[in-house]
Amino acid sequence: MSFDRQLTEDQEVVLKQIWTHLFHLWQVPVDGTHIFPNNSLHSSSTPAKKKKSSWFSKLQSSDHTQDSSEAAEAAHLYEKGKIHKALANLDPQTTKKQFWHDIKNETPDATILKFIRARKWNADKTIAMLGHDLYWRKDTINKIINGGERAVYENNETGVIKNLELQKATIQGYDNDMRPVILVRPRLHHSSDQTEQELEKFSLLVIEQSKLFFKENYPASTTILFDLNGFSMSNMDYAPVKFLITCFEAHYPESLGHLLIHKAPWIFNPIWNIIKNWLDPVVASKIVFTKNIDELHKFIQPQYIPRYLGGENDNDLDHYTPPDGSLDVHLKDTETRAMIEKEREELVEQFLTVTAQWIEHQPLNDPAYIQLQEKRVQLSTALCENYSKLDPYIRSRSVYDYNGSLKV
């Protein structure tokens, strides 16, 4: 959970524009006319520059999912109530429900601002990116995180089970900025152990679990430590690398703190020369190569570094015990769940009402406007607290709940 109180006036306008587009999709009454200068959707606090298409954007097929499509480039006039082209193919009520479930323990503004920053404060490009993400997620991501490891075992998803039991990627504490750390051990990877889809599901489960570790007033992002000890060419698999790049560029923007590549062997050099050409400059800027424990200490404290790497973390990475369901007692309490969900729905409606007033209010920075801002912060906090209450009633407990490292 985090709040951004450092927005400039122009940046705040872009945030309001994105909320206005979402409101029109969700059929929430709001008049955003005065926040679209010259009645154009092309507002940006920085000059828009043409850039090369990322690997992700080259794969897009439908109009509403293309970041470089007409939805992101065409200058059409704003009309009160008119749904932006990038959102036109989305179901209003399904998308609304999904959005408020997906934010979990992050504030609504923090979630949207990640997309805005990724598109350099260009409202059109942001809404195109956000529209694609909403389409991509649908109900899939919530099913993965809420079902957790238990659902994987119950459905006998052998490839995902293999990755879990190898502990190929695990969450191991925090970095020096209190970002959760995902430890990845590529030496354990062999493409024949799972299908591409199973590896993608495992990756999404770990990424979504890491988001539950976010701490209030600290960066809502994750650090990934790739330990290349023992890595050989038999472990190399480009498909999952491309998938991870896609995820962080397109669906988890501004969510990567650092990507630490530790003890890369010489055979990794030609591989790196290929991979680096796929990277968005923002993602590339987060990559750091480390060679020893002292260099790791610049990013992660010893208590969170596994002992085999020279740290003090004694977590057992050789033996995996799957959750047995004994902590899932609240999942059957549908009455309490319904009560907490009703409270959440009421908080969402209050937030939408106050946000519509905040969008429409003029002049800025008068006492009434400041009160609206403060009310939005209060409701955002209440939504985060509500999710903490709701979580045990909708999400099967993970191995991190069992070992006590995760406290939502």
From Swiss-Prot:
Residues 157-317 form the CRAL-TRIO domain. InterPro entries: CRAL-TRIO_dom, CRAL-TRIO_dom_sf, CRAL/TRIO_N_dom, CRAL/TRIO_N_dom_sf, PITP/CRAL-TRIO. Pfam families: CRAL_TRIO, CRAL_TRIO_N. PROSITE patterns: CRAL_TRIO (PS50191). It is found in: Cytoplasm; Microsome; Endosome. SUPFAM superfamilies: CRAL/TRIO domain (SSF52087), CRAL/TRIO N-terminal domain (SSF46938). Keywords: Acetylation, Cytoplasm, Endoplasmic reticulum, Endosome, Lipid degradation, Lipid metabolism, Lipid transport, Microsome, Phospholipid degradation, Phospholipid metabolism, Phosphoprotein, Transport. One of its GO terms (molecular function) is phosphatidylinositol transfer activity. GO terms for cellular component: cytosol; endoplasmic reticulum; endosome; lipid droplet; mitochondrion; prospore membrane. One of its GO terms (biological process) is phospholipid transport. It catalyses: a 1,2-diacyl-sn-glycero-3-phospho-(1D-myo-inositol)(in) = a 1,2-diacyl-sn-glycero-3-phospho-(1D-myo-inositol)(out). Its main location: cytoplasm. CDD domains: SEC14. Present with 9600 molecules/cell in log phase SD medium. Non-classical phosphatidylinositol (PtdIns) transfer protein (PITP), which exhibits PtdIns-binding/transfer activity in the absence of detectable PtdCho-binding/transfer activity. Activates SPO14/PLD1 (phospholipase D1) by stimulating phosphoinositide synthesis via the STT4 PtdIns 4-kinase. Modulates ArfGAP function through effects on SPO14 activity. Inhibits phosphatidylcholine degradation by PLB1 (phospholipase B1). May also regulate post-Golgi membrane-trafficking events and have a role resistance to oxidative stress. Forms a complex with 2 TSA2 subunits. Binds phosphatidylinositol (PtdIns). Belongs to the PITP family. This is Phosphatidylinositol transfer protein CSR1.
